[in-house]
From Swiss-Prot:
Presence of keyword NADP: yes
Gene assigned in the entry: anuI
Molecular-function GO terms, alphabetical: oxidoreductase activity
Pfam family, one: adh_short
Keywords, ordered alphabetically: NADP, Oxidoreductase
Protein name as annotated: Short-chain dehydrogenase anuI
Listed Gene3D superfamilies: NAD(P)-binding Rossmann-like Domain (3.40.50.720)
Family: Belongs to the short-chain dehydrogenases/reductases (SDR) family.
């Protein structure tokens, strides 16, 4: 088992976009060891190679396909055997639509929820024993959500996240589900001193959004990094770190 002297952070979807930018920012501090997760070994190793030149942190590629329980279980077993525990889990990976242009409505909902909701729920449940095994004083689970998942502002005629501007019912509802899962997990795990916090990066220029967006991936990663590493559990409990990198109270 490898000796870990820095907090160990696992980031899903870390080979591109917000996940890669988050890994980059954490790696640049030299204060964290990273598990760089992607759907394939090739993608994970490619991301590690790009990150290696800018850090003295340990970078370990790991394969995680959120649509496959066996993949998640195998990844957890690898982390347990290699490191013994995990300190911070960042559930970043997600999709906004089915990859099948001919998918039915039911198939489209299922594809997005499979990754964005079921995958995140299974990741958290599977890696929770490793978080419980951690001796780190500030264990965290960060779930990446979206302002589009906030039900109240979907009605607003003035909000940039209004349903009048962005319909996207499948993606929006998947992020609403993540918000509720996060709230329930936060309350449940508070007594174990494991913080569950949400981060909403905003509309960023990544492949996820077709290269469109008002923020760079680097800007979008900042709320994720803050949620993962800054503030106290008391300060962050029940909060969301929004796309302006500020804390939002209950009600999202």
């Amino acid at each position: 088992m490898a000796a870990v002297t820095k907090p160990l952070v696992l980031i899903t979807g870390a080979n591109q976009g917000l996940g890669f930018a988050t890994a980059q920012q954490l790696a640049s501090t030299g204060q964290y060891n990273l598990l760089v997760a992607a759907r394939s070994q090739e993608k994970a190793e490619g991301a590690v190679k790009q990150l290696e030149s800018s850090t003295n942190s340990s970078l370990t590629p790991i394969v995680i396909d959120l649509d496959q329980d066996e993949s998640i279980t195998a990844a957890a077993k690898f982390v347990e055997e290699r490191f013994g525990s995990l300190d911070i889990l960042i559930n970043n990976a997600g999709i906004n639509r089915s990859s099948d242009p001919n998918a039915t409505l039911r198939e489209s909902y299922r594809a997005v929820f499979e990754t964005n909701v079921f995958g995140v729920a299974v990741m958290t449940a599977t890696f929770l024993p490793l978080l419980r095994a951690s001796k780190y004083h500030d264990r965290r689970i960060v779930n990446v959500t979206s302002g589009l998942g906030q039900i109240g502002i979907a009605y607003s005629p003035t909000s940039e996240y209004s349903a009048k501007i962005w319909e996207l019912p499948i993606y929006r509802s998947s992020k609403s589900a993540i918000n509720m899962i996060s709230a329930v997990d936060a309350v449940s795990l508070e007594k174990e001193n494991i913080l569950v916090v949400l981060a909403a990066p905003g509309f960023c220029r990544t492949n996820f959004g077709g290269g469109q967006g008002v923020k760079s991936a680097e800007e979008g990663a900042r709320p994720i990094v803050r949620a993962a590493t800054e503030g106290s559990p008391k300060e962050l409990f029940g909060k969301l770190v929004d796309d302006e990198n500020t804390l939002v109270e209950f009600g999202w």
